[in-house]
A protein has these predicted regions:
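Long, structured stretches of catalytic cores involved in phosphate-ester chemistry, encompassing
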Residues: 1-183
Length: 183
């Protein structure tokens, strides 16, 4: 957190193993969310062995990222088997609208039919409970990857997608399906 506050680097990027902003009710996530009987994420049932410290560390990281005075507050992560982008404007009582924290699910390269969260967990990735996020791309369960270009004044992202079962000949002509710039 001190590095985010004191760094003179143009960009400081956080790359946690579990995503920031979205959940599928998995055990090791930052969030206490579980899939409820109504098909929505909920915190009414305690998640087995979940620790409050996970969310407290998440909250500290988001506060430090939003407080950065240089560069883009940015998290890149995978592990939800999806492609997505959003700007976190609220986390609980914390208001980040002045400097939203950008979060990107960079995509899985080889998930099969039973590996998608909607198949394995019964829910696609959803915005975690207590998070306010402006999504420019809601989580999309497709194989793919993200190319991130770091420029002095901005970050440009290009997302590519692929679905198993499509002809391999299409890979040579793969084009980005979603592009966005983070100023």
């Amino acid at each position: 957190m001190a590095r985010m506050k004191d760094s003179n680097a143009r960009h400081v990027v956080n790359v946690p193993s579990t995503p920031i902003g979205w959940s599928a009710g998995k055990w090791g996530e930052w969030y206490p969310d579980l899939l409820g009987n109504d098909g929505k994420l909920s915190t009414t049932v305690p998640k087995y062995m979940w620790q409050d410290g996970w969310k407290l560390q998440h909250d500290r990281l988001l506060r430090a990222a939003s407080a950065m005075t240089r560069g883009v507050p940015l998290f890149l992560s995978g592990d939800l088997h999806a492609l997505a982008h959003g700007a976190i404007e609220r986390n609980g009582a914390d208001d980040f609208r002045r400097n939203p924290v950008h979060t990107v699910l960079t995509g899985p390269v080889s998930t099969g039919p039973r590996g998608w969260p909607s198949a394995a967990r019964g829910t696609p990735p959803r915005v975690a409970t207590g998070i306010g996020i402006k999504e420019t791309l809601a989580p999309l369960e497709m194989n793919g990857f993200t190319i991130v270009d770091f420029l002095p004044e901005r970050v440009e992202c290009s997302m590519y997608r692929w679905k198993i079962g499509r002809p391999e000949s299409e890979l040579d002509g793969l084009q980005p399906f979603h592009r966005f710039t983070i100023p």
